[in-house]
């Protein structure tokens, strides 16, 4: 039995000064009927809470830590940079070096602008698309989360889905009217939207692998169909690769699926665990951004040297071979979960993409937000608490992706499968 007394005390204090006791809603553990676990430190594939409980970590700070916790080279890069000064508000050479690395690895990006979060990246890309096309409407997909920008919270996933909110109060009717939504993986729905609004649509923004309703890969022809539609109607195709960038493949999801968007949004991995975002794409589009062009975007800490050094050192270390290992480990996890769930008579549907995967307690194949919502949420809540008690730290929401790092091995996968078997035995009797 795990002891969480220090975490409970810390949460009680946090609620006095933070809304709901946290700085991001899903961290409150409300959807799993538990109090949040306060972490103290991490190393490799493991994380340890303030009570001294150690866990195999499948959250990895919600995706950024693809090299695991406290990677020595990343920590060293941050330390050396901090000793020189934490921020200057001027250009630094490391910004250019990280930009070159991103351009080398992400097929669609010819020029890139660094920002401070994934939300800032998607908001800026949307503004750029509207300014470039002189149009106002945006098409997005139900259950996809593109950050907390107002126009992108319409029928969103991630924490919005976790809380069961269709939209967020505070989003104006005008913004909602300019946001068109269709189900993810529904190319026919997208075609109908373009038939009705085609000349008004500035851009389609899509996660090439939806990671905020669980993990939902694109069906055959979906991304290709969006590329054809946007080209036909003169709209821009924006890939939100904040989560999938450098997680699905060495060349990101667009490289794996061989579909090239006009603009790409990045975050998470390219900051190595520090706040960062980026958006980039075709030179002719990106040069519309100030000071080269008239579409404004700026940021006090954009391209700050700590995040740039952490991101550069993270991306630099990744090799194509890492992704072969990721797929082998995820396959081992999938096969184990499938065997155990069948033996324990627990309905289970599994999706995977590179170093991320998702599982749903349902008999249905999960291809969009509606099918994701068929998962047995009551079973998930009980399952989550049992797994946590056995030292497995998973996202405290059915609608979040699960991640592995270069520090996860067969040992961690097998321990997780043992815990899953024990949990299913307890819950199924």
UniProtKB/Swiss-Prot annotation:
Keyword Electron transport (UniProt): no
PROSITE patterns assigned: AA_TRANSFER_CLASS_3
Keywords linked to the UniProt accession: Cytoplasm, Isomerase, Porphyrin biosynthesis, Pyridoxal phosphate
Taxon lineage: Bacteria, Bacillati, Bacillota, Bacilli, Bacillales
CDD domains the record matches: OAT_like
Subcellular localization(s) per the UniProt record: Cytoplasm
Primary location recorded for the protein, binned into one broad class: cytoplasm
GO biological process, one term: protoporphyrinogen IX biosynthetic process
Species whose genome carries this gene: Listeria monocytogenes serotype 4b (strain CLIP80459)
Residue positions where N6-(pyridoxal phosphate)lysine is found in the record: 268
Gene Ontology cellular component terms for the protein in this record: cytoplasm
Cofactor: pyridoxal 5'-phosphate
Reaction it catalyzes: (S)-4-amino-5-oxopentanoate = 5-aminolevulinate
Record-listed E.C. numbers: 5.4.3.8
Keyword Isomerase: yes
This protein's pathway: Porphyrin-containing compound metabolism; protoporphyrin-IX biosynthesis; 5-aminolevulinate from L-glutamyl-tRNA(Glu): step 2/2
Family annotation (InterPro entries): 4pyrrol_synth_GluAld_NH2Trfase, Aminotrans_3, Aminotrans_3_PPA_site, PyrdxlP-dep_Trfase, PyrdxlP-dep_Trfase_major, PyrdxlP-dep_Trfase_small
Pfam family, one: Aminotran_3
The name this protein goes by in its record: Glutamate-1-semialdehyde 2,1-aminomutase 1
Record-level Gene Ontology MF annotations: glutamate-1-semialdehyde 2,1-aminomutase activity; pyridoxal phosphate binding; transaminase activity
